Design a protein with these regions (language model features):
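N-terminal secretory signal peptides that target proteins for export/translocation
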Residues: 1-7
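Bacterial N-terminal signal peptides
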Residues: 10-24
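Short, low-complexity intrinsically disordered segments enriched in A/P/G/S/L with frequent Arg
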Residues: 16, 62-74, 78-83
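Conserved serine DD-peptidase/penicillin-binding transpeptidase domain
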Residues: 28-42, 98, 114-337
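Short N-terminal amphipathic alpha-helix/helix-capping patch enriched in small hydrophobics
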Residues: 31, 35, 47-49, 102-103, ...
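A short, well-structured edge-of-sheet supersecondary motif
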Residues: 39-64, 80-92
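A common structural microfeature
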Residues: 48-50, 95-97, 103, 123, ...
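Short active-site loop at a secondary-structure junction
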Residues: 91-111, 336
Length: 337
């Protein structure tokens, strides 16, 4: 596959950082005519746009300076101060607050296509630490993630089916999840907009299951009295209010449910559900993100008829065992489509 020049890749990332950091730091300049023409053609008023185009900062340690004169005392001269950057080439409404746009993902997507290629697959590798006899694994089952960004319920079910199809029905041991492919700092789900339960606030993970999201499905019964509450994916060790009474209308159906997510193991709905809403889904970023994959894997394994004498636990850098099955992600081109 033909790849783009490396310097363009680096320039794209640097430009992203510059645009991110430089906003609000410059006096306004008029928009060039080609940009105003493009905005007019798209039906976008100039007042709805903010942009900054600025020179790239020099790489760390590459401060340009004149040759250092000799020092008779032999002492080291003090390092000169970095030179200020030239003014931005374009600064249109740099200080006007705007709703955040999905711009950063354009650069990460570009880098993924350039460095990995559109046909790249992530691999979730499953191995066994022990031996299999009469359908029972005497030992641990190891599931090692590689950062698959779209390991959703359907594909995790395919992986479980493949494990069972190769002859493991029960596990006399533990299921060990290894998400250690990334070295990540602690993630604060509330840092962006102080709403940590929004699914888009789930953090990255080397074994990210279902985008880190738990979905509650509200299904009114035919009798018109209650609505069933169904969770997807199935999760082990979590209690959820199984049904809620119905009320007239719909309106702010989430607010009327009286949801309590304060205890990740005991999720309550103490209000009512609008009968006129029909079936609705409510997705949240699971509050105890560090144990979400464990609970989902155990819930889906048991729901598939699998036995487990031990528990599901996370061990980063777990020693691999005998390869058993490998789950492939969708190709990169399909994931970003």
């Amino acid at each position: 596959m033909r790849r783009l020049p490396k310097f363009l890749s680096r320039a794209a990332l640097a430009a992203a950082a510059t645009l991110w950091l430089a906003g609000g730091a410059a006096a306004q300049t008029p928009l060039p005519s080609d940009i105003t023409d493009a905005l007019a053609k798209a039906g976008v008023p100039p007042q709805a746009v903010a942009m900054v185009v600025a020179p790239l900062p020099p790489p760390p340690g590459a401060v340009s300076r004149a040759p250092e004169p000799a020092n008779p005392s032999g002492e080291r001269n003090a390092a000169p101060a970095p030179q200020p950057l030239p003014p931005p080439r374009l600064a249109w409404q740099p200080d006007v607050p705007m709703n955040p746009a999905s711009v950063t993902k354009l650069f990460t997507t570009y880098m993924a296509l350039d460095q990995l290629g559109p046909g790249y697959f992530w691999k979730t590798r499953v191995s066994v630490q022990g031996f299999v006899k009469d359908g029972t694994l005497q030992g641990n089952l190891l599931v090692k993630g590689s950062g698959d960004p779209k390991l959703v319920v359907e594909r995790l079910q395919d992986l479980i089916n493949a494990i069972r199809a190769r002859g493991i029905r029960d596990i006399n041991g533990d299921i060990v999840l290894d998400d250690g492919i990334f070295r990540l700092p602690p993630h604060d789900a509330a840092a962006f907009d102080d709403d940590p339960l929004r699914p888009y606030n789930a953090g990255p993970d080397g074994l990210l299951v279902n985008f880190g999201a738990l979905v509650f499905k509200f299904q009114p019964d035919a009798g018109g009295r209650t609505a069933r509450v169904v969770t997807e994916p199935p999760v082990a060790g979590i209690e959820v209010t199984p049904e809620v009474p119905l009320a007239k209308g719909c309106g702010d159906w989430r607010g009327r449910l009286g949801a309590d997510f304060s205890d990740p193991l005991n999720i309550r709905f103490t209000g009512r559900y609008g009968a006129a809403c029909g079936e609705r889904d409510w997705a949240i970023a699971y509050p105890d993100a560090g144990h979400f994959a464990e609970r989902v894997f155990e819930g889906m394994w048991r729901a598939s008829g699998g036995g487990l004498s031990g528990r599901v636990r996370t061990q980063r850098g777990a020693p691999p065992g005998q390869p058993w099955v490998t789950g492939l992600s969708l190709p990169l081109a399909q994931i970003i489509a």
